[in-house]
Structures are given as structure tokens and as C-alpha cells.
């Protein structure tokens, strides 16, 4: 049997895997155990009451977290004309059309989010095999294909997170950093859960938010008692 690291031993001693923790208690526990030499991200896993095999029950979307994610997001925008100027004014890091596509083809992708105006999709569509596997392909469902590219840029910069359930019906995303206050993490988590509830497929039956767990980059998951959260839409 593999030898447990000191950190894993401490986590096993401190975290009761059978318990759902009140949110402030859960955050305090995560912060106590976040001992890496870098500021760890706070991630969330939400088990949804859906049948992920059915396309009409898949959940996908985006929402802006009130306190952002703690990351500096670089945004590339495929657009032209007046939209290009608007994107730059909104804070886009890279703006272009065919020239930007050539950069992508060369592997020059120094950005975290790609936004495109509808008229630019003829260019972006050729990049699907490059952008798709990296989760960068613009999509109208998450607001990254839009005539209002300036708003999309501002949302991305403000800490918008995109979510999509995996094959097991679980949503994984980031809701902040371990150096956020408990209140900031709580409010970010609540904002995400409200967005998920609004995105509940009409065909999904029973309890929708089945389990909510938060963790840090190098830590174990801590289950959160949903009664300690305000998720009224």
C-alpha cells in the first residue's frame, strides 16, 4: 500500500467524510489544510440529479461570480470593425480575425477565454479541432458567441465561470482562491448554485442539487450542508 504523505494523514485526521459541514466551517477547514507553497484554488463539485446519458438533461452555461475567481483572465476576441474597437475598450487582450486564426494555428494561444461575434464564426469554425479539445471553442450557450463582444469580455474579466456536467452528472468548476474570505467563497458558491438551479432541465426529476463538495487544489473534498447556504433564486 502506498505510504500516505504527511499532508494526506492530516487531511484524514481532520476531515470527516461522512459529515456535511456548515459552509463557514467547511471553508475554515479547507484554509487550515491549504498548506501548498502557492495560493490554492477553491474548487467545487456539484452532483446533479440528472441522467447525463440523455441530451435533454445535460446542464451547460456560465455565470459571473460576485467576487471573481482570483485569476487574471486573458481574453481573445474574433471580430472586426466597430466591434473590434469595443472589445479593446472593454479590456480584450487580443483582437483579430484571420491574423488571430493564424496565431492559433501556430500554437500561440496565450489566452484563457475566446469570444467571437457571429460574423467571425466562419473563421473560428476552422479552428474547432484546436480550440475544442482545450475547452476554448466559443459557444452561444455560454455567451461567448455574441454580437455584444464588449459585454462578453467584461464578464470574462469579472470572473465568469463556465460549467458543464460530466458523464456522471457532476459539475466541476473553480469558485475562488484559498486566501478569499469565508464570506466571499460562500457568496460565490451561492451564485453558482442559483445559476445551476435556474438551468435545471424540465425533464430532471427529484432532488436536483444532490451533493455539494468544495476542495482546494491539493486537498480533499469537504461536503457542504446546503441548509447553510442561501440559494433562493
From Swiss-Prot:
Alphabetical list of InterPro entries matching this protein: Ribosom_uL1_bac-type, Ribosomal_uL1, Ribosomal_uL1-like, Ribosomal_uL1/biogenesis, Ribosomal_uL1_3-a/b-sand, Ribosomal_uL1_CS
Keyword tRNA-binding listed: yes
Biological-process GO terms, alphabetical: regulation of translation; translation
Key words of the record: Repressor, Ribonucleoprotein, Ribosomal protein, RNA-binding, rRNA-binding, Translation regulation, tRNA-binding
CDD domains linked: Ribosomal_L1
PANTHER family assigned to the protein according to its UniProt record, in alphabetical order: 54S RIBOSOMAL PROTEIN L1, MITOCHONDRIAL, LARGE RIBOSOMAL SUBUNIT PROTEIN UL1M
HAMAP family: Ribosomal_uL1_B
Function: Binds directly to 23S rRNA. The L1 stalk is quite mobile in the ribosome, and is involved in E site tRNA release. Protein L1 is also a translational repressor protein, it controls the translation of the L11 operon by binding to its mRNA.
Family (UniProt): Belongs to the universal ribosomal protein uL1 family.
Record protein name field: Large ribosomal subunit protein uL1
Organism (species): Vibrio parahaemolyticus serotype O3:K6 (strain RIMD 2210633)
Source lineage: Bacteria, Pseudomonadati, Pseudomonadota, Gammaproteobacteria, Vibrionales
Gene: rplA
